[in-house]
Amino acid sequence: MNPNFLDFEQPIADLQAKIEELRLVGNDNSLNIGDEISRLQDKSNTLTEDIFGKLTSWQIARLARHPRRPYTLDYIQHIFTEFDELHGDRHFSDDAAIVGGVARLDEQPVMIIGHQKGREVREKVRRNFGMPRPEGYRKACRLMEMAERFKMPILTFIDTPGAYPGIDAEERNQSEAIAWNLRVMARLKTPIIATVIGEGGSGGALAIGVCDQLNMLQYSTYAVISPEGCASILWKTSEKAADAAEAMGITAERLKGLGIVDKVIGEPLGGAHRDPAAAAASIRAELSTQLAMLKEMDNDTLLARRYDRLMSYGL
């Protein structure tokens, strides 16, 4: 199976394979088979629209984890200029599962913080599969307080299965690090915009997710636990993950309907991994618009609005 396609995308993968074969034949024999390639490409696009027009919550959860999906550093490269990464929590070490630093958006200095996963095995291990340890969240907190001091807006990118649950993380007080971030972010006197770009997993996501504006990409998820974890608790088997995903309401559209998410950002046909530049352009446009709106508010109004937003959850 083509690793660029999930199992429910297999009919699309088959068509794309035929298109590639025709292109190779045309290149080798100087044949003009453009009409047939165009016909198959149109058929592929129609099939993609049909499949993606009726995705289940579980299929969206799997898209959110797609191995080719753009990560935080990919979006930084496409959206921002003059990015200067900052390292370390000034207490223990630097956690590569959280990246952050100063950059410019439309010439405006901003602080960027986000989860980062890896692509290859070695990089996945170095990034701890996008699961931060306490030092990652303390690094994020340090950068957020720096942003407040220098009056820079904070833009966070959420993409994690959750905070790392290992013994070493618990020994360094993982829960305290997350709780402290929630406390600090609720009071920061600078605009905060959070965007879920993949998985939004539990407290590991929320630790950089307290904000004035919450965006979700169309095929991202946000939940207190993974569908597999929920299924294992309720049904004693992870095979019920699809049922759990549907019951939990983890998708962007469901969360928008509940008033938790402010904006669902559309993705290119087939998902952000099909056209990362287009996905980044959509995010950039929303960030620019939202930042301009938030910058019009004074600090008292900003904090009061943030407080009311948080207190409205669950009502």
UniProtKB/Swiss-Prot annotation:
It is found in: Cytoplasm. Acetyl-CoA carboxylase is a heterohexamer composed of biotin carboxyl carrier protein (AccB), biotin carboxylase (AccC) and two subunits each of ACCase subunit alpha (AccA) and ACCase subunit beta (AccD). One of its GO terms (biological process) is fatty acid biosynthetic process. Pathway: Lipid metabolism; malonyl-CoA biosynthesis; malonyl-CoA from acetyl-CoA: step 1/1. The gene is accA. This is Acetyl-coenzyme A carboxylase carboxyl transferase subunit alpha. InterPro entries: Acetyl_CoA_COase_a_su, ClpP/crotonase-like_dom_sf, COA_CT_C. Component of the acetyl coenzyme A carboxylase (ACC) complex. First, biotin carboxylase catalyzes the carboxylation of biotin on its carrier protein (BCCP) and then the CO(2) group is transferred by the carboxyltransferase to acetyl-CoA to form malonyl-CoA. Residues 39-293 form the CoA carboxyltransferase C-terminal domain.
